């Protein structure tokens, strides 16, 4: 899948989001912030974990790290049950490669958690479906589309 597929998803679901084509690759938060001339906190990361064998999408912002202990506590499992999914697994579940993955529009709908810090911003930027695209939207729109739980899980 790519930014064209993401745009179709946005259009079909009447989502208030804009895909921004860029002239450079944005594989990291720093790359994306520089390309968009925004603060790193406005860049959201969509990370796939396996929790007790089930996929979970976790969205946090900037350079913040997801605290596996906090995730485990929220989910009622031991910390060792919360593991990062491999890039191949991420692609199989979402249809997008790591570094381009949007927070929604995946091949498979995933249970989603959004860190509370993401909801405190006016505008956020997530993966746009390709390494040379980002998507602009509001936290409210993200929560509406993803049906995410808001949880404080960043370190």
List each language-model region with its residue ranges.
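Extended, low-hydrophobicity, polar/charged segments
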Residues: 1-155
